[in-house]
Amino acid sequence: MTDAGKRILVMAGGTGGHVFPALAVAKYLAQQGWQVRWLGTADRMEARLVPQYGFDIDFIDIKGVRGNGLVRKLAAPFKVVRSILQAKAVIAEFKPDVVLGMGGFASGPGGVAAKLAGVPLVLHEQNAIPGMTNKLLSRIASQVLCAFKNTFTQVKAKVVGNPIRRELIALGGEPKQTADEALKVLVVGGSLGAKVFNDLMPEVVAALSKQQSITVWHQVGKDNLAGVKSAYQQQGQDGGVNVAEFIDDMEAAYRWADVVLCRAGALTVSELAAVGLPSILVPYPHAVDDHQTRNAQVLVEAGAAFLLPQAILDVNKLVSKLQLLANDRAELARMGQRARDVAVLDATEQVAQVCIALAEKG
């Protein structure tokens, strides 16, 4: 049976950790002849990003419920009912063969609307600890997928990894030059940057450069460029440091790096595994349910990463870890291989095949 003419409604939004894995699946299915439509919210990143990939997007009015004030929580049930009706209208008009929920505000109402409309619902959870929306929807979904083992305890879920871009998967097979060159450290704190990295790294580089040759590519986040550049200059380290507000080409950044200092978002952890890079992971301390620490454990337990909680992070600890890696390039290479060994490289295809199978069953 041909897949041409099949339709999928993709629900993902809010953060890159939801949107980019969903885009990988959407692109794959579009190449198979599927019609793809997106459900999101107008004030989040999907509104800008999804149309750039050529996909139509519909918006519903919904805000996060968790962690808000009392008045918003009291109003939440009415907002949820309204958004379910909006999502149901989109489903009635588009008539998808399957609905794929990958997180974000729109997934909850959209998932309920899919169930009410009798359309197969596939869920994918990117984090090691599921979000509230996916916990609830997992009870009504046709199929539950997850990136990491032991994510769901109340329902049966299939572990498929996190869908990531093909270009990054190919990058993992390239040899790394780790001989006597300067240690190349990629520092990534997300689109907003990470203040703790911005504050500490100028001192870290100054201390390390007295003993080691080191170069740094540092993504500092929006509005932080001038301040961090100045801090490096004050430490006399502006020569070997490339400071950027945002790194658009992560493929180039990963190809360049020997080691990555970063948060432990689900997509980041999966990308580090796929490209085969050692890492120093500092989980975002305010993440819901501390899910970034659980994400990080996948690489830490494999011997592919060091875990440094932000509460104990300081200049000396970062210098110590980077010094260790700079002095033992063989271990650096082994850590990279261990990262690659835990990667799930066909996650996009696995998620897509589940959607295809459910659509064909009707």
UniProtKB/Swiss-Prot annotation:
Listed EC numbers: 2.4.1.227
Record's subcellular location: Cell inner membrane
One example of a Gene Ontology biological process annotation: peptidoglycan biosynthetic process
Superkingdom as given in the UniProt entry: Bacteria
Enzyme class: transferase
GO molecular function: UDP-N-acetyl-D-glucosamine:N-acetylmuramoyl-L-alanyl-D-glutamyl-meso-2,6-diaminopimelyl-D-alanyl-D-alanine-diphosphoundecaprenol 4-beta-N-acetylglucosaminlytransferase activity; undecaprenyldiphospho-muramoylpentapeptide beta-N-acetylglucosaminyltransferase activity
Keywords: Cell cycle, Cell division, Cell inner membrane, Cell membrane, Cell shape, Cell wall biogenesis/degradation, Glycosyltransferase, Membrane, Peptidoglycan synthesis, Transferase
Binding positions (UDP-N-acetyl-alpha-D-glucosamine): T15, G16, G17, N127, R165, S191, I247, A266, L267, T268, V269, S270, E271, Q292
A Pfam family per the record: Glyco_tran_28_C
Membrane topology, from the record: Peripheral membrane protein
CDD domains per the UniProt record, alphabetical: GT28_MurG
Presence of keyword Glycosyltransferase: yes
Annotated NCBIfam families: murG
Similarity remark: Belongs to the glycosyltransferase 28 family. MurG subfamily.
Protein name, as recorded: UDP-N-acetylglucosamine--N-acetylmuramyl-(pentapeptide) pyrophosphoryl-undecaprenol N-acetylglucosamine transferase
Organism the protein comes from: Shewanella oneidensis (strain ATCC 700550 / JCM 31522 / CIP 106686 / LMG 19005 / NCIMB 14063 / MR-1)
UniProt gene name: murG
